[in-house]
């Protein structure tokens, strides 16, 4: 269980904080100079390491909830420790954040957790009442990139219609309208990635169910799928090295992955009724010129393409907390009984 790694992770954080000269001394947001509509980010830069006003952690496998900044409380921590919605390293984020925040007398927050769900109602119907589509994906980086683009073009995020393509260890392609992520693939669907299969033919998958245990099959589709299943590596750079020396199998699998990502972006263009202001490309794979060039061939007819390589999720966490401290957004609480 992921919870078994909690103390180890806490020790690593303590060591990193100590080496950087941070000590957990608390101070209220008001005393620190954080007031509604204030410039908290600038003040924080000069505030030093003497006092903590907030601690942010990565949101984990929680019940479906709106995007936003959430106050971490005992209810949320209990839900994450129970891991009813799956084991994931992000389940430790809020638990660790609350531990360190309490030692400093500060509040702990999560921002846009992986289960943050803003889908429109029609996106939830799967084709069978036995199975409802639910969202798990890269909300934090996806929403942060959308907001970043909005700032750069001088428009409100809520006024833009965007497709965001996140390409990391998993692939999330999402449609954004009126400041909400109204549809996307979930981590169990869509394009295959470095180690996930994405969508599979259902009847073929049913036939596999009797050939291996549920745990083994789950691993095959979520951890040992995608590039790894075909090529034995999750490393995109290794795949590109093979392509450079003429490996046709590597080239074929690479091309199929980009093809599927482009196809998913086309589906999101349909969700937005063809009215798209920009296609934003982000995540670790966006560092690859080859990936971006191939992908442009599939999506640049939709709208102008803007590339944001990498995943600046630490900044996204900080920005989410600053929106609360500045009074731009109210901190939410996870609903009970979900």
Language-model features: where?
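Conserved phosphate-binding/catalytic loops in two-lobed NTP-binding clefts
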Residues: 289, 293-319
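Phosphate/pyrophosphate-binding loops at sites that engage ATP/ADP/AMP, CoA/4′-phosphopantetheine
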Residues: 13-27, 43-53, 152-156, 265-277
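Structural signal for terminal/edge beta-strands and the immediately following C-terminal loop/tail
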Residues: 309-338
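Glycine-rich phosphate-binding loops at beta-strand->alpha-helix junctions
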Residues: 276-295
């Amino acid at each position: 269980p992921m919870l078994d790694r909690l103390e180890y992770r806490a020790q690593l954080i303590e060591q990193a904080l100590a080496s950087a000269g941070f000590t957990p001394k608390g101070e209220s947001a008001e005393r620190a100079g954080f007031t509604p509509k204030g410039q908290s980010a600038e003040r924080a830069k000069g505030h030093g390491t003497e006092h903590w006003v907030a601690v942010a952690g990565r949101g984990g496998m929680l019940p479906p909830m709106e995007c936003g900044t959430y106050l971490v409380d005992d209810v949320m921590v209990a839900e994450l420790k129970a891991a009813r919605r799956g084991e994931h390293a992000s389940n430790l984020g809020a638990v660790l954040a609350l531990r360190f925040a309490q030692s400093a007398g500060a509040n702990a927050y999560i921002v846009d957790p992986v289960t943050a769900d803003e889908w429109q109602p029609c996106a939830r119907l799967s084709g069978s009442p036995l199975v409802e589509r639910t969202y798990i994906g890269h909300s934090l980086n996806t929403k942060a990139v959308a907001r970043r683009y909005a700032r750069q073009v001088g428009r409100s995020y809520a006024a833009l219609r965007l497709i965001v393509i996140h390409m990391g260890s998993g692939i999330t392609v999402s449609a954004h309208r009126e400041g909400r992520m109204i549809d996307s693939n979930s981590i169990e669907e869509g394009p295959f990635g470095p180690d996930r299969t994405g969508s599979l033919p259902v009847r073929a998958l049913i036939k596999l169910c009797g050939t291996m245990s549920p745990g083994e099959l789950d691993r095959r589709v979520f951890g040992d799928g995608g590039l790894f299943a075909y090529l034995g590596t999750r490393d995109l750079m290794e795949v590109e090295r093979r392509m450079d020396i003429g490996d046709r199998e590597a080239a074929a699998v690479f091309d199929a992955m980009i093809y599927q990502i482009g196809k998913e972006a086309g589906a999101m263009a349909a969700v937005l009724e063809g009215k798209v202001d920009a296609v934003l490309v982000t995540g670790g794979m966006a560092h690859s010129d080859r990936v971006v060039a191939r992908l442009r061939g599939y999506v640049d007819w939709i709208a102008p393409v803007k590339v944001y390589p990498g995943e600046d999720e630490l900044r996204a966490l900080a920005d989410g907390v600053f929106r609360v401290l500045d009074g731009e957004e109210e901190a939410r609480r996870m609903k009970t009984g979900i």
